[in-house]
Amino acid sequence: MSMFLDTAKISVQAGRGGDGMVAFRREKYVPNGGPWGGDGGKGGSVIFRVDEGLRTLMDFRYNRKFKAKSGEKGMTKGMHGRGAEDLIVFVPQGTTVRDAETGKVITDLVEHGQEVVIAKGGRGGRGNIRFATPRNPAPEIAENGEPGEERQLELELKILADVGLVGFPSVGKSTLLSVVSSAKPKIGAYHFTTIVPNLGMVRTKSGDSFAMADLPGLIEGASQGVGLGTQFLRHIERTRVILHVIDMSASEGRDPYEDYVSINNELETYNLRLMERPQIIVANKMDMPEAQENLKAFKKKLAAQYDEFDDLPMIFPISSLAHQGLENLLEATAELLAKTDEFLLYDESDLVDEEAYYGFAEAEKDFEITRDDDATWVLSGEKLERLFVMTNMERDESIMKFARQLRGMGVDEALRERGAKDGDLVRIGKFEFEFVD
């Protein structure tokens, strides 16, 4: 059995920017050489690229951590450190990427060669050549490199198919796919012969072509996990037309109309939007005894569920085994596809908003102040923490610069308003210092 994996959880971490360098020009005949430390190189980003040759997420079963390289440190003579190469991660077509913490959709990768930056590499820290001023012509200040983005991701593969086959097990879905395409799904006279999705390309006599997916059979209660559950129904979400295959011979003792209602209930329970897709009812096994009588009863029950002004779903009697009625079914499917647009997979609320909106709004706080049980003041906030990690705490001038930045952000004043006294401990991350009033 071929291994098929359509979900995965991974972590990605972009590379850190290289540290800037503190250096001075010391050459004969060059008095007052001045600062000469270069900037660090940028960290590598993590980029997802679509590869049409991949069919599953199997590559992510054991390799779950992806980390790009960091940029090189700045060098003397004002030379920049080398930037790190981006890490390219190949994914199959139809991969949806979500943020594991928020559940938001980051991107939907459907085209071969499509690339998306999933985690951006940090910028390189500036060398001391960048901090020279008339007041301080020989600064001993350099920045650390910026940390790269780190994310926990959920990958979900939904195969790209125009048409999806649904129905109870052993109604003939795999046989139908095998006779209308070059696909070779496993076929057997027992339930759940198909345990992974199969995909085949179908070409009609008129020259139209489309992709058809055969999904593992559903049974009543699948939405509650009975049988194989609905774990593979995600693959039908990209389809535009559903072929609902029914065993009209009732060879297993079930009523064909009850089968039809049960499967539609499972589709609706899984995702209401699946019922928006047009359905064609495929009355299979019409070469079997009692199939004609069952089809008449099926049509009568179906008509009773619709108003006289409603359009009934199209019904095509076929026999996959005897190759009967297939041409009409495929031509009708192609015509329905031609006039059916793609369906929206996600609500706007599910998507990560990457657009920028400009207008008057209250500025977000640059920092937050809390107090631990041990009476230590704790500073946090994205901007403040970013400034902190880019500060070289081994150099006094860099520390003094960071203190000025905190003062400029209003941290000192905010601490006083909260009741901080001279000598109180203040913590940023794991770094502690005394508050000086």
Curated annotation (Swiss-Prot):
Pfam family, one: MMR_HSR1
Cofactor entry: Mg(2+)
InterPro entries: G_OBG, GTP-bd, GTP-bd_Obg/CgtA, GTP-bd_prot_GTP1/OBG_C_sf, GTP1-OBG_CS, GTP1_OBG_dom, GTP1_OBG_dom_sf, OBG_GTPase
GO biological process, one term: ribosome biogenesis
One Gene Ontology CC term in the entry: cytoplasm
Principal location: cytoplasm
Boundaries of every OCT domain copy: 359-437
Gene Ontology terms, MF aspect: GTP binding; GTPase activity; magnesium ion binding
Residues annotated for Mg(2+) binding in this entry: 174, 194
Domain OBG-type G, first and last residues per copy: 161-338
Subcellular location: Cytoplasm
EC number(s) recorded for this UniProt protein: 3.6.5.-
Disulfide bonds: none
Keywords from the UniProt entry: Cytoplasm, GTP-binding, Hydrolase, Magnesium, Metal-binding, Nucleotide-binding
Enzyme class: hydrolase
Gene3D superfamilies: GTP-binding protein OBG, C-terminal domain, GTP1/OBG domain, P-loop containing nucleotide triphosphate hydrolases
Obg domain span: 2-160
Binding site for GTP: 167-174, 192-196, 214-217, 284-287, 319-321
Assembly and interaction partners: Monomer.
Homology family: Belongs to the TRAFAC class OBG-HflX-like GTPase superfamily. OBG GTPase family.
Function: An essential GTPase which binds GTP, GDP and possibly (p)ppGpp with moderate affinity, with high nucleotide exchange rates and a fairly low GTP hydrolysis rate. Plays a role in control of the cell cycle, stress response, ribosome biogenesis and in those bacteria that undergo differentiation, in morphogenesis control.
HAMAP family, alphabetized: GTPase_Obg
Name under which the protein is recorded: GTPase Obg
The organism of origin for this protein: Streptococcus pyogenes serotype M18 (strain MGAS8232)
